[in-house]
């Protein structure tokens, strides 16, 4: 089954790993999809800049699944060097979302 996989690198990271990535490379042009809480923390830390656009991740599994590919296309359109996505919950209800995100993040490495 074919899934959309951006050509841009798409690591799936925990919130603290996203924060560390942005801190370690202040010039990294990254597009992000993170939770509201993580977005606030990054903004309060001064880690969100004009070359780091953010999409707030949907809070429910149904909304996340419904908006996933549109959000990936929007993130790619920003033209960033990397797309950092905060890992969604790993509970069984989110299994399909996690599978689709994993495919989107990994497929480009098979080329």
Q: Positions of the model-derived regions?
A:
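A C-terminal functional module that forms or caps the active site or interfaces directly
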Residues: 1-106, 110
């Amino acid at each position: 089954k074919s899934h959309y996989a951006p050509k841009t690198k798409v690591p799936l990271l925990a919130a603290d790993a996203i924060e560390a990535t942005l801190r370690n490379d202040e010039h990294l042009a990254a597009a992000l999809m993170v939770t509201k809480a993580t977005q606030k923390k990054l903004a309060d830390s001064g880690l969100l800049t004009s070359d780091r656009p953010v999409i707030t991740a949907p809070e429910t599994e149904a909304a996340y699944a419904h908006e996933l590919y549109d959000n990936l296309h929007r993130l790619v359109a920003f033209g960033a060097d990397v797309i950092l996505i905060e890992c969604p919950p790993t509970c069984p209800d989110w299994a399909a979302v996690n599978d689709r995100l994993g495919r989107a993040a990994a497929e480009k490495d098979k080329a």
